[in-house]
Amino acid sequence: MFVEKVLERTTNLELCSILILLVISLSIYTFYATLNTYLRSVLLSLRLTGPPSLPFLGNCMLVTDKDLMRRCAGKAFDLYGSLVRIWVLLFPFFAVLEPEDLQVILSSKKHTNKVFFYRLMHNFLGDGLITSSGSKWSNHRRLIQPAFHHNLLEKFIDTFVDASQSLYENLDAEAVGTEINIAKYVNNCVLDILNEAVLGVPIKKRGQDVAMMEDSPFRQGKIMMPARFTQPWLLLDGIYHWTKMANDELNQKKRLNDFTRKMIQRRRQIQNNNNGNSERKCLLDHMIEISESNRDFTEEDIVNEACTFMLAGQDSVGAAVAFTLFLLTQNPECQDRCVLELATIFEDSNRAPTMTDLHEMRYMEMCIKEALRLYPSVPLIARKLGEEVRLAKHTLPAGSNVFICPYATHRLAHIYPDPEKFQPERFSPENSENRHPYAFLPFSAGPRYCIGNRFAIMEIKTIVSRLLRSYQLLPVTGKTTIAATFRITLRASGGLWVRLKERDHPLIAH
């Protein structure tokens, strides 16, 4: 008995020793691998050029540069070449600009992980499709993707039409003939669409819900990440945690999450009362059904994904619509071609558009794509490489951080001659046929291609066509240029100003 206890104790001690040695060995290996990747990235960065950087801060202060997009990103290829060195604090990043190189990275499932600073958006977007990585991202993508099937998207057209009509009525009541920042009105319209399409709050039948949605935290959301980069010490969570900014962000997250949970409860009650068939099905309904058949998809996951769609969809689509309308204002010949196309599609009818009508808006789609080329809603994407990548001129080590900059790639003169000019014909079938598929990235590309891209294009077409059928868009003297600024999504500093004039022969009855 004594001998058996000694042997048992010895075996346990040996097992503990082995486990401790294993943990130490793995820690040493991880440290060595991380250090090796870091040193290789630093050595490569020293052979590349990029914008001037500051000691310790690197290029973080570029976030404060209101002229960053035009002065730096728009001319990146001419200034620095196809691979640009960027320092984020003491960490080297590589901005990849050429479509051939981008395809190597974006098309591979091995490079779908996001870099460390995406977690800074968790208190804003939650841990949803935009910010998550690994198995969580791939599982959620697989589960949610069917909700954006072509046949289901068609059911959202009535939502787009109702919101567009509401936008028209608001403009007709207070904006015709005056100078307006069209972005403000468009953003409200897009939020109306998302309220119904994502949360299930009908646009025309809100009743008591109107006040509730007017106070919606999704109208007031503010992302703190850019401010943390301008004060890089706040990138350290141990310091940031004690700031007023962090407290405000946590309170904002609580408001967003609590509000979304109320919406989930509301949709569950509607489903339980068998009233679901009387209302348009929304994304929350789909996600509730997913959670009922997949235990791993929890209510917290529904909240995170709903916040992602509400907040990301609001900024990106709102900007795309506003930029498109503004550019049509500055290019009246393109606006006239869009109006002629709409007259051909609708003839003398004042009916709302169908899915077929939206597909027939081919020239308008060219205009939308050209607006997205010039002003992509998300001008910067970051990825962490899962393995070594050989590009045309350089090799990037596994684990290194890369930037994909659609704003810069969309301005490569050897792909888009005279890149600052608005030319929708670039996207005609004959002109697009031989263009590299990764030369146009408004919705990213590859496995992480934006899940809502077709939803967004349909939404934009519906809003733009509704306004063009009733109004002529005119420029505002002294406000004919765009000062693009980068705040995660692309914004127009100072707004996008237009004048609306009632058409003598509107293409739709009022």
UniProtKB/Swiss-Prot annotation:
What cellular-component terms does GO give this entry? Answer: endoplasmic reticulum membrane
Top-level class of the enzyme under EC nomenclature: oxidoreductase
| Pfam families reported for this sequence | p450
Matches recorded under InterPro entries: Cyt_P450 (IPR001128), Cyt_P450_CS (IPR017972), Cyt_P450_E_grp-IV (IPR002403), Cyt_P450_sf (IPR036396), Cytochrome_P450_Monoox (IPR050196)
Q: Which SUPFAM superfamilies match?
A: Cytochrome P450 (SSF48264)
PROSITE patterns reported for this sequence: CYTOCHROME_P450
As one GO molecular function, the record gives: iron ion binding
Annotated membrane topology? Peripheral membrane protein
Task: Name the domain of life this protein comes from.
Answer: Eukaryota
Is Iron given among the entry's keywords? yes
Residues annotated for heme binding in this entry: 450
Its needed co-factors are: heme
Localization recorded for this chain is:
Endoplasmic reticulum membrane; Microsome membrane
Q: Does the keyword Endoplasmic reticulum apply?
A: yes
Disulfide bonds listed in the record:
none
Where this protein primarily resides, as one coarse class? endoplasmic reticulum
* EC number, UniProt record: 1.14.-.-
Gene3D superfamilies to which the protein is assigned, alphabetical: Cytochrome P450 (1.10.630.10)
Record key words, sorted: Endoplasmic reticulum, Heme, Iron, Membrane, Metal-binding, Microsome, Monooxygenase, Oxidoreductase
Function summary: May be involved in the metabolism of insect hormones and in the breakdown of synthetic insecticides.
State the family it belongs to.
Belongs to the cytochrome P450 family.
Q: What is this protein called?
A: Probable cytochrome P450 4aa1
Source organism per entry reads Drosophila melanogaster
